[in-house]
Curated annotation (Swiss-Prot):
CDD domains: TMEM168 (cd21494). This is Transmembrane protein 168. GO terms for biological process: regulation of ubiquitin-dependent protein catabolic process. It is found in: Nucleus membrane. Plays a key role in maintaining the cardiac electrical stability by modulating cell surface expression of SCN5A. Plays a role i the modulation of anxiety behavior by regulating GABAergic neuronal system in the nucleus accumbens. It is a multi-pass membrane protein. It comes from the Eukaryota. GO terms for cellular component: nuclear membrane; transport vesicle.
């Protein structure tokens, strides 16, 4: 007994000590990374102090000494606020502002007369060491998982250091100072572009780096200090391209959730920047040396640029109009836990973004061509504006590209509920006791409420929810289903997914039992679907809560020309009454809706002994399905709806871009692998891409 007790105590102590060592190891690792960051900061401070001291020593400029002493005084105040008054935000803001300002002074003060001085050389090596330590610290932090990524455009540290650096540039002449201030704005745009993981962010970074040290950009006297400032700011967003796990809507949240007025003003701000760039480009016309090339080139490509950017600004305005509509729905349905991306998907934002992506690409192309035609290597203001416009348009292109790829398609749903106990198994009417009638009505009402909840939660447009105790005739059902299957979105194209729910009496072979002895076969329903769907690649998902849904599940697997899925249920034939209640119609609907509408549900479809089992089947080409991509007619309709007639010639160019398919070989191989998976290894849970899943037990 004592030996057992001693063993238990020693084992528990061993586990506790092992866990304590692991925690201490984690804490020590975290502390080491934090101290590495402090070392990089202190090293940079020493480099700045030494560099400013050398400039004061060699130039005897008393203003440098005053600013240097004032900077140390401000940093001392920041330390006091941090350690004695716990005012961390104010302390860090003050220190970051002055770090940017002092580093800017180190860049802009002339050092041509003492470049070979030992102290100046030491300053350069300290700055290079700061760059290495900063990159190493940022990399180790992310590899160790100590960085919590939050949605933001610019961090407070980045903003204040940029402001401080821009203030320091005012020590130069007005034209040079304006060039540097615009360059700082371009750097801010580049940081945001990288943090948003825009599709063209890396090419923009390369272009910015190549142009950064042009003499026309008024590169400071100390390029090492300038490189230190640039690299230290760009390191975090550049590494986050790989390490950040934020989704598209999470990354863009500071912009998408911004107020309506702020977003409208951002379009006007963009228009002002674009107009300024065009005016600066026109200064190239003063170059009389190559007038025979410049004047025709600027006239042609300038006109093309203006048309493309009118389209660009109208696209941004239309995007914000649709986003405002989504925000209204989001505010009204916030209690239903509907996310903004689900609402945007239901409003057809994906289709809008896919077309807008191509239009914004034309704007980027036009800007690049106009910049090349109007290239002014001696005009720093022009080059700085060029570096502002590129990431700005790249961000718009990246936003439309990512939303077009991540948002789900539009969907519409129709539900039919016919109580099954109004007739006997041979189809003859039968009288029911009053209590059974009440139970039947409650169960049918529960199914209607559940499917309406499902439609509302997943933002599925509801065509109707029909409830009939006497059944539906074939003609009535035919007219209703045809009207449902030909529904279209507000923008014109068909919905991506059509969801049809049926709960009612069925025959043994799966046909729906209708009033008057009529039946509806799956073949008949698919004929109507082919007639309405045509060449359009929409999906039809049929959800059956009936006693004989398995035949349709098996039959749908033979279909080769359409994207059709059937989700059904199997009710247990024999049930031990002592262990579980007999299954009834409506039980599957309740569980399936709960599974798809409640992320914290505890429903296990593979659980043994389930009285209601799920089963689904998909057509052979189901895995080939992709959400509808804009066709030439879609682009033309979008153009006529949103843009003036003068821009219509660009429709043909847009249609040509839509028709490009450069990776068809890779796509064909991938399609074969997905078909093999769906035919041989049908997954237990199949994500439809609309927010809900098909399941099998």
């Amino acid at each position: 007994m004592c030996r057992s007790l001693r063993y238990c105590v020693s084992h528990c102590l061993y586990l506790a000590m092992t866990r304590l060592e692991e925690v201490n190891r984690e804490v020590n690792m975290h502390s080491s990374v934090r101290y590495l960051g402090y070392l990089a900061r202190i090293n940079l401070l020493v480099a700045i102090c030494l560099g400013l001291y050398v400039r004061w020593e060699k130039t005897a400029n008393s203003l440098i000494l005053v600013i240097f002493i004032l900077g140390l005084f401000v940093l001392g105040i920041a330390s006091i606020l941090y350690y004695y008054f716990s005012m961390e935000a104010a302390s860090l803001s003050l220190s970051n502002l002055w770090f940017g300002f002092l580093l800017g002074l180190l860049c802009f003060l002339d050092n041509s007369s003492f470049k070979s001085d030992v102290k100046e050389e030491t300053t350069k090596y300290l700055l290079l060491t700061s760059i290495v330590l900063r990159i190493l610290c940022a990399l180790v932090e992310r590899i160790s998982g100590y960085v919590r990524h939050r949605p933001t455009l610019l961090t407070t540290v980045e903003f204040l250091e940029l402001v401080g650096f821009a203030i320091a540039s005012t020590t130069m002449l007005v034209e040079k100072s304006l060039s540097v201030i615009l360059l700082v704005m371009a750097l801010a745009m580049l940081i945001i572009d990288l943090r948003m993981k825009s599709f063209l962010a890396i090419p923009n970074l390369i272009i910015f780096s190549v142009l950064l040290f042009f003499s026309s950009l008024e590169t400071p006297q100390n390029p090492i200090a300038f490189a230190c400032f640039f690299i230290c700011l760009v390191t975090d967003p550049f590494l986050d391209i790989y390490f950040s796990g934020l989704s598209v809507t999470e990354r863009w949240k500071p912009f998408l959730h911004r107020g309506r007025i702020c977003r409208r003003l951002s379009v006007l701000f963009t228009a002002m920047i674009e107009l300024t760039f065009f005016i600066l480009s026109a200064f190239k016309l003063r170059d009389t040396h190559l007038w025979y090339f410049v004047i025709p080139g600027f006239s042609i490509f300038g006109f093309f640029w203006m048309i493309c950017h009118i389209i660009f600004l109208l696209t941004l305005w239309g995007f914000h109009t649709k986003l405002n509509d989504c925000h209204k729905v989001y505010i009204n349905h916030r209690a239903d836990n509907n996310s903004l991306d689900r609402i945007m998907a239901s409003k057809g934002m994906r289709h809008f973004c896919l077309i807008s992506e191509q239009l914004v690409f034309f704007s980027l192309l036009a800007t690049a061509i106009l910049g090349a035609v109007s290239w002014q290597p001696t005009n720093g203001i022009f080059l700085s504006m060029f570096l502002i416009v590129l990431p700005l348009e790249s961000m718009a292109h990246g936003l439309f590209h990512e939303l077009g790829n991540c948002l789900g398609g539009t969907s519409v749903g129709y539900a039919i509920v016919i109580p099954t106990n109004f007739c006997s198994p041979d189809g003859q009417p039968t009288l029911l006791p009053p209590e059974h009638v009440q139970e039947l009505n409650l169960r049918s009402t529960g199914m209607l409420n559940a499917i309406q909840r499902f439609f509302a939660y997943h933002m599925i447009e509801t065509y109707g929810c029909d409830y009939s105790t006497s059944g539906l005739s074939f003609d009535t059902l035919h007219s209703k289903l045809k009207a449902f299957l030909e529904l279209r979105t507000v923008d014109g194209p068909r919905h991506d997914t059509y969801v049809l729910y049926y709960s009612g009496h069925t025959h043994g072979s799966g046909e729906w039992a209708l009033a008057g002895g009529d039946i509806l076969r799956l073949d008949t329903l698919l004929e109507w679907w082919r007639e309405k769907n045509g060449s359009f690649c929409s999906r039809l998902i049929i959800i059956l809560d009936s006693e004989n849904s398995t035949p349709w599940v098996k039959e749908v697997r033979k279909i080769n020309d359409q994207y059709v899925a059937v989700q059904g249920a199997e009710l247990a034939k024999t049930v031990d009454i002592e262990e579980a209640d007999p299954p009834q119609l409506g039980d599957f609907t309740r569980d399936w809706v709960e599974y798809n509408c409640n992320s914290t549900n505890n429903i296990c479809w593979t659980e043994k002994g389930r009285t209601v089992r799920a089963v689904y089947g998909v057509s052979k080409r189901w895995s080939d399905y992709t959400l509808h991509l804009p066709t030439g007619s879609d682009v033309a309709k979008h153009w006529m709806l949103h843009f003036p007639r003068v821009t219509y010639p660009l429709v043909h160019l847009a249609n040509w871009l839509c028709g490009l398919n450069l990776f068809w070989v890779c796509k064909a191989c991938f399609r074969c692998l997905k078909r093999l998976k769906m035919s041989w290894f049908l997954p237990t849970v199949l994500d439809t891409g609309q927010g809900f899943k098909l399941v099998k037990s």
